[in-house]
């Protein structure tokens, strides 16, 4: 299975600084074991897995986070990194809010003056 995988430094405006997170853009919803194995291989504090809900990006994305050893309920920097990936790859227009459906509820990210909130 081919998967788009990005490494994003959150809370940084200079490469190789900030808090890194891996972000996987998924076409299908793989099983939990596969996501855990990817997170172990990335060996970052968190790896985010995004899959689009419905037929349009505006319908939101399912978002899950895994550490190298377990799934976690919430991760701020990997959420911001996920929004960055959606906007920079053109999956979602920059002026649109990114909506993430997570185990912790609905999370939303927007941009303001070049920063992700």
Task: Give the residues covered by each predicted segment.
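N-terminal lobe of the biotin/lipoate ligase/transferase fold
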Residues: 1-71
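Acidic, low-complexity central loop/insert segments
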Residues: 37, 59-62, 66-117
